[in-house]
């Protein structure tokens, strides 16, 4: 299997208790089956075993979760913002989500792509301060690929198209010109892949980002204080767009909707520009949206249906 990662990936280090926005607070903690099987083997007299049994529960979808403590804190997060489970039985036995966050993993046949989500403030800060264009490195791992039914021809077409998208973003033009070119490229590519009709649902740009499932009230304050202004021609904005292209572009293999994926990249720069223009802004958006299935499903739907997010509407915002 071929493993692809951004070159900055190896430099990421969790700052644990010093994190300004703990990933152990604000959202549910899923308990995966493999971890649960291990917890069953723990000595019943162990304090950590008893704590696990006390807080283990089911959500409305019958998924195994740990009941959150007050202020939506993970029940194993101690007063120093460190994980008691990690301390007691080792990080390798924490739930899969905890072991991998903020990393994301996408498998496409014999290729695995790995990255770091903006929902981690350290990762967002790394991308915000990174100089130069987003670069990648690859290595071979002796591991069987995950079986999936992707169409090889479509995968190759989209992979080549994604490289074109990266090339557009890496040009010497002003970022607004690059984003316009990127969006028009996606529109043409979408016509080749098949119709993906845009609707005219009346909703304001601000209301798009007033998520029904609120994790951090600070995000809503940012949305309420939106300021429309020109996009800064910075590495940070280029890297924001490149992040979305890397993370989402190839998902079009499954639904042939490449236009929405590219819209997400372009709108990501508008989010940064209108709501705060710093790493914290992008971090909060990511935590609020990318890590809430409800909010993310709503956002993906609006990328197709909202009048303010139609291709021509976004192009007007880029002028």
Question: Residue locations for each model-derived region?
Answer:
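Gly/Pro-rich turn-and-neighbor structural signature
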Residues: 51-81
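Hydrophobic, aromatic-lined core segments that form the binding pocket/scaffold
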Residues: 167-319
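Local cysteine-cluster metal-coordination motifs and their immediate loop/turn environment
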Residues: 11-29, 69-104, 117-124
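Internal, well-ordered alpha/beta segment that forms a basic, Gly-enriched binding/recognition surface
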Residues: 81, 89-177
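Alpha-helical scaffold elements adjacent to nucleotide-binding pockets in ATP/GTP-utilizing enzyme cores
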Residues: 38, 97-100, 119, 299, ...
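A structured, charge-rich N-terminal accessory region that forms the first stable segment of a protein
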Residues: 21-58
């Amino acid at each position: 299997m071929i493993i692809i990662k951004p070159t900055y990936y190896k430099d990421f280090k969790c700052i644990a208790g010093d994190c300004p926005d703990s990933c152990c607070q604000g959202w549910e903690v899923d308990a995966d089956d493999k971890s649960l099987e291990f917890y069953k083997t723990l000595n019943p007299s162990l304090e950590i075993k008893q704590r696990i049994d006390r807080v283990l529960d089911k959500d409305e979808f019958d998924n195994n979760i740990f009941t959150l403590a007050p202020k939506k804190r993970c029940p194993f997060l101690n007063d120093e913002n460190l994980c008691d489970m990690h301390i007691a039985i080792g990080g390798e036995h924490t739930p899969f989500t905890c072991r991998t966050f903020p990393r994301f993993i996408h498998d496409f046949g014999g290729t695995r792509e790995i990255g770091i989500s903006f929902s981690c403030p350290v990762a967002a800060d790394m991308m915000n301060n990174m100089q130069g264009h987003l670069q990648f490195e690859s290595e071979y791992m002796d591991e069987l690929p995950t079986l999936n039914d992707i169409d090889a021809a479509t995968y190759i077409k989209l992979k080549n198209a994604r490289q074109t998208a990266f090339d557009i973003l890496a040009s010497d033009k002003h970022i607004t010109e690059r984003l316009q070119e990127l969006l028009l490229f996606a529109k043409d590519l979408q016509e080749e892949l098949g119709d993906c009709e845009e609707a005219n649902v009346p909703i304001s740009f601000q209301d798009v980002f007033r998520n029904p499932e609120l994790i951090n009230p600070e995000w809503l304050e940012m949305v309420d204080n939106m300021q429309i202004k020109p996009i800064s021609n910075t590495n940070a904005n280029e890297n924001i767009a490149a992040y979305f292209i890397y993370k989402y572009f190839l998902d079009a293999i499954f639904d042939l909707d490449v236009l929405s994926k590219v819209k997400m990249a372009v709108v990501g720069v508008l989010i940064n520009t209108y709501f705060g223009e710093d790493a914290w802004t992008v971090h909060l958006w990511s935590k609020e949206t990318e890590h809430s299935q409800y909010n993310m499903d709503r956002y993906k739907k609006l990328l197709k249906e909202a009048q303010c997010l139609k291709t021509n509407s976004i192009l007007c915002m880029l002028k």
